[in-house]
């Protein structure tokens, strides 16, 4: 049905109701199945999460599968779809930082275009504990990625996982969100 999303000083509202997420960060693997996508395993995973009181997941640092979003749609699980674990500053030697300049806009665009019609998606995340969160460059990149999301989907908020609160506030990085 029709839904509305609002974020204000009180928090996150879905269809006019204030929501306090009971969520988890969920990596894309299915335990011993690895990264293979299996509908029955996804249904089992979401059912277990719901049985323990979970109503939301944050996809951890990768574009989620369409099948996972379909299962979340059908089971009423809210999703924050997250794109990146790093931007320009590497967290490891062979990570996404090597490809960020060439691929970030396409990857962010693909995430939003692929999943924006899924009712389970309640917000977009442009990064997880990004090292640039303490810098002016990070603030600029954050604004750029947020603008991509809002251009393609003006109906949902954009956020990111920050682990250095004081530095994020001092650099203006946190205020972009």
Describe each PLM feature range.
Residues 140-177:
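Extracellular glycoside hydrolase catalytic/binding regions
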Residues 1-143, 158-159:
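Active-site-adjacent substrate/metal-binding segments within catalytic domains
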């Amino acid at each position: 049905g029709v839904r509305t999303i609002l974020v204000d000083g009180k928090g996150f509202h879905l269809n006019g109701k204030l929501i306090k997420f009971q969520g988890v960060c969920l990596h894309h693997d299915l335990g011993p199945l690895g990264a293979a996508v299996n509908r029955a395993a996804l249904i089992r995973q979401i059912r277990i999460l719901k049985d323990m009181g979970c109503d939301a997941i944050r996809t951890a640092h990768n574009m989620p599968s369409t099948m996972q979003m379909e299962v979340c749609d059908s089971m009423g699980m809210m999703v924050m779809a997250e794109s990146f674990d790093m931007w320009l500053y590497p967290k490891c030697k062979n990570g996404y930082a090597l490809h960020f300049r060439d691929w970030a806009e396409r990857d962010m665009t693909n995430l939003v275009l692929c999943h924006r019609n899924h009712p389970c998606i309640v917000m977009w995340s442009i990064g997880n504990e990004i090292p640039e969160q303490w810098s002016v460059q990070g603030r600029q990149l954050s604004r750029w990625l947020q603008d991509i999301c809002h251009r393609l989907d003006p109906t949902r908020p954009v956020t990111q996982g920050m682990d250095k609160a004081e530095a994020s506030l001092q650099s203006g990085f946190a205020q972009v969100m």
